[in-house]
């Protein structure tokens, strides 16, 4: 049972299966992803804020978008600022270009939040081409409020940087603020993951929202047919199921509250998380992962994030979380007996 991934716990929308079956496998997919991008525009636009198709870039998962960003913005010995610990592919994509990477570490002894004022000083003095922040963050679940992102955007504007906000887990924030307001600013890009929102991990699908100029620059470097036909059709179908994310969110909130309470009852430290995963401070993450794996449960050892005392647990259906809680109780009891 895989708790190491963090995707919607209720499976893909039912209509996705029919959409996939309708795809002609002998035909090339639309290289422009027009139907999908139009569906994204309909989904995110409101009467007061219309998003044009020219401001939407579809990608083979959001990870492709980060690799496009680094190729375009960091190719000439550029600099990137990463707010860490965070998703490792940001660093990986930057390193492929030979860029200088600046890291602003969160307070790992406290609430896992970043010193945003320190971040703005780095941006204004170092003038990095890219500033990347995951919001809510992976693996800590920290969610920056509107004012904090605003400070970063203000600094990016002064420095001539592009602020990239990865919102892969935004759909599972209980009370989010409207980040689409940021699209009024040319120095900001939002990146979202349909893979996680709609449990379509095998298909790989994400999208970015930015100014027409930024989207056009990235599109020049994106291979044709990057997003396959199955993913395009599945994405259109998923967005049409307007009640899906409400059902997924309710499932996440219920199971997350249960699991957090159960693990705290075991004496484990479980920091507040605004995402569809939680951290648990277990002492020796590698050991706990191994012991849980022996019981058929897979969790994420956070050593690679620089957090060797923590495991990350993705939220699955409540029944699965009940089984994990029981398994972790057995591991905790065995640890006390040693």
Where are the model-predicted features located?
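PLP-dependent aminotransferase class I/II
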Residues: 13, 187-264, 268-271
């Amino acid at each position: 049972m895989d708790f190491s991934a963090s995707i919607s716990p209720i499976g893909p929308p039912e209509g996705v299966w029919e959409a996939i079956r309708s795809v002609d496998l002998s035909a090339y997919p639309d290289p422009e992803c027009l139907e999908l991008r139009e569906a994204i525009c309909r989904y995110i636009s409101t009467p007061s804020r219309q998003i044009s198709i020219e401001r939407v870039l579809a990608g083979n998962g959001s990870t492709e978008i980060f690799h496009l960003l680094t190729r375009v913005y960091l190719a000439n010995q550029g600099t990137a600022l990463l707010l860490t610990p965070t998703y490792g592919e940001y660093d990986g994509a930057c390193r492929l270009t030979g860029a200088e990477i600046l890291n602003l570490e969160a307070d790992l002894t406290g609430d896992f939040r970043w010193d945003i004022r320190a971040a703005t000083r780095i941006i204004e003095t170092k003038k990095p081409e890219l500033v990347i922040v995951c919001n809510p963050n992976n693996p800590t679940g920290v969610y920056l409020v509107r004012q904090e992102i605003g400070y970063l955007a203000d600094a990016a504007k002064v420095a001539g940087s592009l602020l990239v906000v990865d919102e892969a887990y935004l759909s599972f924030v209980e009370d989010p603020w409207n980040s689409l307001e940021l699209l009024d600013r040319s120095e900001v890009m939002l990146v979202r993951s349909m893979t996680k929102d709609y449990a379509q991990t095998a298909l790989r699908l994400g999208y970015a929202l930015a100014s027409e100029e930024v989207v056009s620059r990235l599109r020049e470097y994106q291979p044709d047919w990057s997003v396959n036909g199955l993913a395009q059709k599945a994405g259109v179908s998923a967005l049409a199921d307007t009640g899906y994310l409400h059902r997924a969110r309710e499932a996440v909130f219920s199971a997350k509250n249960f699991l957090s309470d159960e693990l705290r009852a075991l004496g484990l430290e479980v920091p507040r998380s605004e995402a569809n995963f939680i951290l648990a401070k277990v002492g020796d993450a590698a050991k706990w992962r191994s012991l849980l794996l022996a019981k058929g449960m897979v969790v994420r050892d956070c050593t690679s994030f620089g957090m060797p005392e923590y495991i990350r647990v993705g939220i699955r259906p409540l029944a699965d979380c009940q089984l994990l809680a029981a398994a972790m109780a057995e591991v905790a009891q065995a640890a006390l007996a040693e």
